Amino acid sequence: MGKIRKLDDQLSNLIAAGEVVERPASVVKELVENSIDANSTSIEIHLEEAGLSKIRIIDNGDGIAEEDCIVAFERHATSKIKDENDLFRIRTLGFRGEALPSIASVSELELITSTGDAPGTHLIIKGGDIIKQEKTASRKGTDITVQNLFFNTPARLKYMKTIHTELGNITDIVYRIAMSHPEVSLKLFHNEKKLLHTSGNGDVRQVLASIYSIQVAKKLVPIEAESLDFTIKGYVTLPEVTRASRNYMSTIVNGRYVRNFVLMKAIQQGYHTLLPVGRYPIGFLSIEMDPMLVDVNVHPAKLEVRFSKEQELLKLIEETLQAAFKKIQLIPDAGVTTKKKEKDESVQEQFQFEHAKPKEPSMPDIILPTGMDEKQEEPLAVKQPAQLWQPPKQEWQPPQSLVREEQSWQPSTKPIMEEPIREEKSWDSNEEDFELEELEEEVQEIEEIEMNGNDLPPLYPIGQMHGTYIFAQNDKGLYMIDQHAAQERINYEYFRDKVGRVAQEVQELLVPYRIDLSLTEFLRVEEQLEELKKVGLFLEQFGHQSFIVRSHPTWFPKGQETEIIDEMMEQVVKLKKVDIKKLREEAAIMMSCKASIKANQYLTNDQIFALLEELRTTTNPYTCPHGRPILVHHSTYELEKMFKRVM
């Protein structure tokens, strides 16, 4: 007798369950997606012990006919595709026909379903075996209960996390589904306590408010773009509203939530230098495309996809985000902290905006006060700050648009994956309806972020603090400017322009600079010599494991030439494979930081005016190249509120 044998269906389903049903969140995902495919407009999810004891999904969808109930629990049985051509034009969330038999094989499952035009069907399955099947009275839709998950595969239970973590995984999945299908009303309960309720009115922003809070919803920038192949819609937060994890970015493709690193990277690239290192935005991006352009049959969980025109899609995302931010004045509003806000678990940001006309970058020249001969040398730091110019005295009134709900400036860093965001409350239908109506009203009252340009407003300097921060004012209130970050932005745009030019003017070194490397480093650098020439670094081999530099571009900051060369060499060694775009970017950022004013340096009146004028000419006067804010705004209203002049 041969050694190779065909596995029976029960064992095959248990093996398939290892991929499809990894944890309770997988069960919730598959069942809710089935409900959506069945045209449900209302779905309830009830959990006990994070789904390990019980998962119940109730929907008002099409239901399952009696003759289909048994077939639905057979392997690779589905109503969603018929032939191989359908496999390349998938519009439904499910299509593999693996979920139901896999779930039924590792749990005790009860199904009550009806199509509405015939008696319903009641089905009980335990470990893949049908225990009971009978007709029953039932409303249209499906009610499916999964109990004692993994009861017959106890080894799987050893790999389950804590109830808190497993519940976090489920809420994360439900949140993504709610965002991708705002037209469906979703209710999520855990141990009879409500965690989420969306209205199903199709307003994505209201769903985002339910998940992330109304404060975050107020800081959302609408994103919309269209090309021949793709349509993009969604919302992303202003650069100041960030989190410490990428998990707050959601990408939806043809109604399906997917995990795709390159899409998240494209969203980050859309922000470019607006985000601090290690910080990520909250974002929701829905992408519609011809199903022929995306392969969703990559993994049984259907979370991974492949795109046939990936580069075109990434470019569209980056350009769309960059264009949106160029229309907004990205000045953060410092806000006023209140006792009420100190009690809030989710602390959010409050900012204000206005817009900047890109201009040709030019070399900053703020070191010498106006009127001084360039040959003269004067130290930038002086012992006492100079008396600055005073603007004409005016009677200013706080604009009504500035009277807003106050909130703290510090961003929340609590990941949504760890625990449910909203406070658990005992379920009460009347209270629930009231809360939902109240949320709808709040979302409708949110003012759209003005997209009327991002020019820096006129700023009139009034002082300097600790030789680090410049104070300025205008009719909208007080502005605090970080002088180092401001000049860093000016220098960055200058160096970014210079470092990208092929034709370079060079300065000969009086004494060639020698660089000694290990053999591994030498070989790595030798491989990238041509790439280094593109950023103005010309190396000659000198001996066995050394290079020498005889010249450098004239725009290298004076006195820092060797330090910059060492830094660029270190980047090449660290990166292993040189990305010329990244290398130019890093070189520009490094030089801009080293050439900028440092803290504790007092500036003269002329220097401050020159700095602010140079800042005005930049394409992005709001953040330094590292993503830190350059200036912060205190509105007149907020100042008056702090001093109790208004209540």
Swiss-Prot record:
A biological-process GO annotation: mismatch repair
UniProt GO cellular component terms: mismatch repair complex
A Pfam family per the record: MutL_C
Keywords: DNA damage, DNA repair
SUPFAM superfamilies with a match to the protein in the record: ATPase domain of HSP90 chaperone/DNA topoisomerase II/histidine kinase, DNA mismatch repair protein MutL, Ribosomal protein S5 domain 2-like
CDD domains from the UniProt entry: HATPase_MutL-MLH-PMS-like, MutL_Trans
Protein name: DNA mismatch repair protein MutL
Record has Ligase as a keyword: no
Xref: PROSITE patterns: DNA_MISMATCH_REPAIR_1
Entries under InterPro entries matching the protein: DNA_mismatch_repair_CS, DNA_mismatch_repair_MutL, DNA_mismatch_S5_2-like, HATPase_C_sf, MutL/Mlh/PMS, MutL/Mlh/Pms-like, MutL_C, MutL_C_dimsub
Molecular function terms, GO-annotated: ATP binding; ATP hydrolysis activity; ATP-dependent DNA damage sensor activity; mismatched DNA binding
Organism: Bacillus cereus (strain 03BB102)
Function: This protein is involved in the repair of mismatches in DNA. It is required for dam-dependent methyl-directed DNA mismatch repair. May act as a 'molecular matchmaker', a protein that promotes the formation of a stable complex between two or more DNA-binding proteins in an ATP-dependent manner without itself being part of a final effector complex.
